[in-house]
């Protein structure tokens, strides 16, 4: 159950003890301490000093316990609970809507055309929710009772520097898998409160609440005032005990006059002595804790960072520093060693994991390191699951770290900060979220991109076209069948949608094909451009034109398996040109699969700057149209070259063997399309034949190792 504050039931036993002791000591002071100091004047002075101090302790304790230190990313959960199921969505609902939106965009391009008018709908929704929460807060401020309660529950004020630092932390936000929400960089999930705490310091059992950014200053003030309160209590108690044993007759008379005949000198001395002893016993640990936090503030670290650093020092080998990096061993994706060990942490921290087949599903356990495995390779005969079960059965619980101001004084704050950073990096609860903002931007661009595809499908038998896109697109079908929309399919889905983005404007299709660093195998660009351009000036398209658009669009979809993602370049409003980056295929250990990374952008930008220059003959084969429809004729002096031969196609291909990346090169495939005439029976027949080949024919495994072929990036081949 998610706890909102420390007053929420069930109460911790330490919290009950703290409240009980405060009440007993306060009553004892007014009944047994102040009246017996000696004289009315001293009594009034001590009551005047003690009363405001005790009141401040009470207010600060109530305030520090009542403040909700949760991260702002999960505050919507509490706001919705307060409104009794109102219309404020939780972070989980927003995340679910985000995933459902991505799945709808992936499966139905026509849906995206309706949402293209609001490309940042998910972002606007979250902003709208935050505005509704702020509006509810503003309305509650006009309630007089809310103003009185605000003294106890309103969070601590922060300086401008801390606010700027807080804004900077949003750039490196994390995603909590337990809260299912985006949290700030220095937040941590408290398992006692079951929520992420903003700038987590520690969970105080005496308050039954977490101490974080929102109530840390109140916590420090509470300790300081409590020390003063205990000092007054203990000092006055010692003075009264001295009078009991020094002025016995006078004290007996005062006890009878003020408390009645039921109290004698012995019981009175016992009560005063116990209360004084309790005050002194509480004074020393509280003073050490206050001094400890003063050192933390001076060093600029938190209690959590201190605990992590001390635990790392206790578990580190003798003579090793806590900031030493364990060597990060690189593993082959096809090697057997990946079944036992992984260096999946972003900072090179090894943590326990178990690879599944295929190596995309990875299960890790927070703050655990494999004790039975060395950083070297292990044989494939080792069963990590069996070893893990045996280890969990004999697992020794972590020893609690004692709060020591002396150890903190000798601790290097930089080492503590690095140790805490490693702990966050190796956590299975908090994950980095850098790519999440990028995914939101990409999703916005995809909405506008797919809407064009939807409009084309409406004009040219949209039902058939959308069905062909889903059937002939191996990338989208693979993502839809293998990954969840929120994790594994982002890179692949990005490739598919950006390939369709070249159809966003008919006048840009020709430019995109010309600027592509990879060769084009057909002349779909001109025919699609001409068909789209002539649509506004002619009657509706006939059946032959529909068939031509379907075939050319299928060929465009087939090309995206061999093309990189398009890069949008700054351009004037009249003409938006799209550039293409060359990519390299590398193995991502954290994702457990191959990903495409940009190699360079200089070549596409160079081609973009020289697009008005004469096009070489090697590229004319990609842009010439043997059958232009509605396109103005070109001069014979423009250097029209015949289509390249089969040998020239093979020389320009990225890879020469069969590839696992969606069909591989289109070479040595027999021409079986006899229904088309001679003008289109060259490369178009080969492209059409590739689309009709089964998946097993395009993705062939090696007969000896039963593995799919692996290829190195182009930059490494000579």
From Swiss-Prot:
A GO MF term: protein-cysteine S-palmitoyltransferase activity
Compartments it resides in: Cell membrane
DHHC domain mapped to chain residues: 174-224
Protein name: Probable protein S-acyltransferase 19
InterPro entries: Palmitoyltrfase_DHHC, PFA4/ZDH16/20/ERF2-like
The protein's enzyme class: transferase
Catalytic site positions: 204 (s-palmitoyl cysteine intermediate)
Lineage: Eukaryota, Viridiplantae, Streptophyta, Embryophyta, Tracheophyta
Biased composition annotated in UniProt, kind: Basic and acidic residues: 673-687
EC nos: 2.3.1.225
Any single Pfam family the record assigns to this protein: DHHC
GO cellular component: plasma membrane
Composition bias type Polar residues, residue spans: 103-124, 479-488, 598-626
Family: Belongs to the DHHC palmitoyltransferase family.
TM ranges: 16-36, 41-61, 222-242, 277-297
Lipid bilayer topology: Multi-pass membrane protein
Record's comment describing the protein's domains: The DHHC domain is required for palmitoyltransferase activity.
Keyword Transmembrane helix: yes
Reported function: Palmitoyl acyltransferase.
UniProt keyword terms in alphabetical order: Acyltransferase, Cell membrane, Lipoprotein, Membrane, Palmitate, Transferase, Transmembrane, Transmembrane helix
Catalysed reactions, semicolon-separated: L-cysteinyl-[protein] + hexadecanoyl-CoA = S-hexadecanoyl-L-cysteinyl-[protein] + CoA
Disulphide bond pairs: none
Segments of this protein annotated with the region Disordered: 100-125, 454-511, 598-649, 664-718
């Amino acid at each position: 159950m998610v706890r909102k504050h420390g007053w929420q039931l069930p109460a911790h036993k330490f919290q009950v003890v703290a409240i009980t002791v405060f009440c007993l000591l306060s009553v004892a002071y007014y009944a047994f301490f102040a009246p017996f100091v000696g004289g009315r004047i001293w009594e009034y002075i001590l009551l005047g000093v003690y009363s405001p101090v005790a009141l401040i302790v009470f207010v600060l304790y109530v305030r520090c316990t009542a403040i909700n230190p949760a991260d702002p990313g999960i505050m919507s959960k509490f706001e919705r609970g307060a409104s009794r199921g109102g219309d404020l969505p939780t972070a989980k609902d927003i995340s679910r809507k985000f995933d459902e939106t991505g799945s709808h965009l992936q499966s139905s391009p026509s849906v995206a055309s309706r949402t293209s008018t609001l490309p940042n709908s998910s972002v606007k929704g979250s902003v709208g929710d935050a505005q509704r929460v702020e509006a509810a807060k503003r309305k509650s401020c006009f309630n007089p009772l809310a103003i009185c309660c605000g003294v106890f529950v309103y969070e601590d004020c922060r300086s401008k520097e801390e606010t700027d630092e807080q804004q900077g932390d949003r750039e490196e936000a994390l995603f909590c898998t337990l809260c299912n929400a985006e949290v700030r960089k220095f937040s941590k999930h408290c398992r006692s409160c079951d929520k992420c705490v903003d700038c987590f310091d520690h969970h105080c059992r005496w308050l039954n609440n977490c101490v974080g950014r929102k109530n840390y200053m109140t916590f420090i003030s509470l300790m300081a005032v409590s020390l003063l309160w205990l000092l007054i209590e203990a000092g006055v108690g010692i003075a009264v005990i001295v009078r009991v044993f020094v002025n016995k007759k006078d004290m007996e008379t005062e006890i009878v006059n003020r408390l009645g005949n039921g109290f004698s000198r012995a019981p009175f001395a016992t009560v005063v002595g116990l209360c004084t002893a309790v005050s002194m016993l509480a004074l020393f640990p509280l003073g050490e804790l206050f001094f400890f936090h003063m050192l933390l503030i001076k060093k600029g670290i938190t209690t959590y960072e201190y605990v992590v650093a001390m635990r790392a020092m206790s578990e580190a080998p003798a003579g090793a520093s806590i900031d030493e990096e364990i060597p990060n061993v690189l593993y082959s994706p096809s090697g057997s060693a990946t079944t036992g060990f992984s260096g999946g942490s972003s900072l090179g921290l090894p943590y326990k994991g178990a690879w599944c087949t295929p190596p995309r599903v990875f299960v890790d356990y927070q703050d655990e390191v494999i004790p039975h495995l060395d950083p070297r390779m292990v044989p494939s005969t080792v069963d990590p699951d069996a070893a893990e079960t045996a280890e969990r059965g004999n697992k020794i619980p972590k020893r609690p770290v004692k709060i020591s101001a002396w150890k903190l004084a000798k601790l290097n704050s930089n080492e503590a900060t690095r140790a805490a950073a490693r702990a966050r990096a190796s956590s299975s609860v908090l994950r980095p979220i850098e790519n999440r903002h990028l995914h939101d931007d990409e999703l916005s661009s995809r909405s506008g991109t797919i809407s064009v595809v939807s409009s084309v499908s409406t004009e040219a038998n949209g039902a058939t076209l959308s069905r062909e896109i889903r059937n002939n697109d191996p990338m989208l079908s693979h993502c839809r069948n293998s990954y969840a929309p929120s994790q594994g399919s982002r890179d692949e889905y990005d490739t598919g949608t950006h390939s369709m983005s070249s159809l966003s404007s008919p006048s840009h299709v020709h430019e995109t094909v010309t600027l592509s660093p990879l060769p084009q195998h057909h002349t779909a660009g001109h025919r699609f451009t001409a068909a789209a351009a002539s649509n506004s000036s002619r009657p509706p398209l006939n059946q032959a034109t529909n068939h031509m658009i379907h075939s050319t669009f299928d060929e465009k979809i087939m090309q995206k398996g061999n093309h990189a993602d398009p890069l949008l370049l700054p351009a004037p409003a009249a003409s938006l040109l799209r550039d293409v980056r060359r990519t390299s295929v590398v193995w991502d250990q954290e994702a457990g699969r191959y990903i495409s990374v940009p190699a360079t952008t200089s070549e596409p930008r160079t081609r973009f700057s020289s697009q008005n220059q004469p096009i070489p003959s090697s590229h004319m084969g990609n842009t010439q149209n043997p059958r232009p429809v509605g396109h103005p004729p070109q001069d014979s002096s423009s250097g029209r070259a015949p289509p390249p031969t089969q040998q020239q196609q093979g020389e320009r291909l990225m890879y020469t063997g069969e590839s696992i990346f969606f069909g591989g090169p289109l070479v040595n495939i027999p021409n079986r399309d006899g229904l088309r005439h001679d003008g289109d029976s060259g490369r178009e027949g080969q492209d059409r034949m590739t689309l009709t080949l089964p998946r097993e024919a395009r993705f062939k495994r090696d007969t000896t190792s039963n593995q799919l072929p692996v290829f190195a990036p182009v930059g490494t081949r000579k």
